[in-house]
């Protein structure tokens, strides 16, 4: 488990972000928010993929008015993304939003910020301050000459002070940049400057392939320093892909206790089975499991079991047959044509055992 810096806990709907809680995966819808049916359908797909908090754009009154209808039909906390118009924030709060993303300094005069803060306080709704290297305040750019980590932290502290002066402390902060090195430095400095939870992201990271690599490089470095309480992988792709990448990234650092992991070999000339298609099929099969099962798909019956001793269950293919093994020990041989189905059956059994065990632990803790 990667050490994580403790921050103050902040409630978002039925979740708590920060403190000693697990890192939360977020995404954002691509639909027009006023199209309630399309927005709800996309949120449900995101939830099924493992998304825990979802953000919607609220650019106008139609979008703000849709919040209440959307909230009635989804199960995960909903965040309103607001720019400039404080009235949209008030309407979203009235509609039952679980968190508001604003920059207090961009909302306008103090009485407007105060109106949003008072409404958020009354409903117990947190505010996320979204600092972005691409939209820093003019005076900060004039001071530093260009976007810098120090400038981003100064911007964050400025917005934090506005809220703290109004005795508001349910704050989450993001420090996003499209430059990986700048984002890493900004998050490091932010983690030292204040103890509010940090929402991680590399903004405008790119397409599915390039954006995945860029986000993994930047966010991986930040996570490895024990920084971060919630994250979004920003991709020019179906937002479900953002959630999949986020889950894989967290698994890599031992930060996801409710996700399945696939171990598969890179293939070589010794392989006698269609390992690539089998690995893809198994990966898809386990993608929505909410238990920490490790599954191995290997192409060599000689080295396979030994190479995946940590796997809960796996197969190693050979000509015409496969070895089914648990924790590195061979359980039985199965014909090649049914080995994937046999593996799936074993996965189902182990996943059910793990789920029952977790439920039992939960009941014990509640007693």
Curated annotation (Swiss-Prot):
Listed cofactors: [4Fe-4S] cluster
UniProt-recorded name of the protein:
4-hydroxy-3-methylbut-2-en-1-yl diphosphate synthase (flavodoxin)
Q: Which GO terms describe its molecular function?
A: 4 iron, 4 sulfur cluster binding; 4-hydroxy-3-methylbut-2-en-1-yl diphosphate synthase activity (ferredoxin); 4-hydroxy-3-methylbut-2-enyl-diphosphate synthase activity (flavodoxin); iron ion binding
For the keyword Oxidoreductase, the answer is yes
Ligand binding ([4Fe-4S] cluster):
265, 268, 300, 307
Q: Which protein family is named in the record?
A: Belongs to the IspG family.
Taxonomic lineage is: Bacteria, Bacillati, Bacillota, Bacilli, Bacillales
- Keyword check for Oxidoreductase, yes or no: yes
On the tree of life, the source organism's domain of life is Bacteria
Q: What role does this protein play?
A: Converts 2C-methyl-D-erythritol 2,4-cyclodiphosphate (ME-2,4cPP) into 1-hydroxy-2-methyl-2-(E)-butenyl 4-diphosphate.
- Pathway listed: Isoprenoid biosynthesis; isopentenyl diphosphate biosynthesis via DXP pathway; isopentenyl diphosphate from 1-deoxy-D-xylulose 5-phosphate: step 5/6
GO biological process terms, semicolon-separated: isopentenyl diphosphate biosynthetic process, methylerythritol 4-phosphate pathway; terpenoid biosynthetic process
- EC numbers listed for it are 1.17.7.3
Cofactor: how and how many bound = Binds 1 [4Fe-4S] cluster.
Q: Which reaction does it catalyse?
A: (2E)-4-hydroxy-3-methylbut-2-enyl diphosphate + oxidized [flavodoxin] + H2O + 2 H(+) = 2-C-methyl-D-erythritol 2,4-cyclic diphosphate + reduced [flavodoxin]
Q: Show the InterPro entries listed in the entry.
A: Dihydropteroate_synth-like_sf, IspG_bac, IspG_bac-typ, NO2/SO3_Rdtase_4Fe4S_sf
Question: Sorted alphabetically, which keywords does the UniProt record give?
Answer: 4Fe-4S, Iron, Iron-sulfur, Isoprene biosynthesis, Metal-binding, Oxidoreductase
């Amino acid at each position: 488990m990667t050490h994580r810096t403790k921050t103050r806990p902040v409630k978002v709907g039925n979740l708590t972000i920060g403190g000693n809680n697990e890192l939360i995966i977020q995404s954002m819808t691509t639909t027009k928010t006023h199209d309630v049916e399309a927005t709800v359908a996309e949120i449900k797909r995101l939830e099924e993929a493992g998304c825990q908090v979802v953000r919607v754009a609220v650019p106008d009154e139609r979008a703000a008015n849709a919040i209440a209808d959307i909230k009635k039909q989804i199960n995960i906390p909903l965040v309103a993304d607001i720019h400039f118009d404080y009235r949209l924030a008030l309407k979203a709060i009235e509609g039952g939003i679980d968190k508001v993303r604003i920059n207090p300094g961009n909302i306008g005069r103090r009485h407007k910020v105060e109106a949003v803060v008072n409404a958020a306080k009354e409903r117990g709704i947190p505010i996320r301050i979204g600092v972005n290297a691409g939209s820093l305040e003019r005076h900060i750019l004039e001071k530093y000459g260009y976007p810098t980590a120090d400038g981003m932290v100064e911007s964050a502290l400025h917005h934090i002070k506005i809220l703290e002066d109004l005795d508001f402390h349910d704050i989450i902060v993001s420090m996003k940049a499209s430059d990986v090195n700048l984002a890493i430095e900004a998050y490091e400095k932010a983690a030292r400057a204040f103890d509010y939870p940090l929402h991680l992201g590399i903004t405008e990271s790119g397409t599915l392939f390039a954006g995945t690599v860029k986000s993994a490089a930047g966010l991986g470095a930040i996570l490895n320093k024990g920084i971060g309480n919630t994250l979004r992988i920003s991709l020019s792709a179906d937002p479900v892909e953002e959630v999949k990448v986020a889950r894989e990234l967290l698994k890599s650092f031992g930060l996801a206790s409710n996700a399945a992991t696939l171990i598969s070999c890179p293939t070589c000339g010794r392989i006698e089975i269609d390992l690539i298609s089998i690995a893809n099929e198994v990966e898809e099969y386990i993608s929505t499991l909410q238990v920490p099962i490790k599954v191995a798909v290997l192409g060599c019956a000689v080295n396979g079991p030994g190479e995946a001793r940590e796997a809960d269950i796996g197969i190693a293919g050979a000509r015409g047959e496969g070895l089914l093994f648990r924790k590195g020990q061979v359980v039985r041989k199965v014909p090649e044509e049914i080995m994937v189905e046999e593996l799936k059956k074993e996965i189902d059994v182990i996943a059910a055992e793990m789920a029952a065990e977790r439920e039992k632990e939960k009941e014990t803790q509640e007693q």
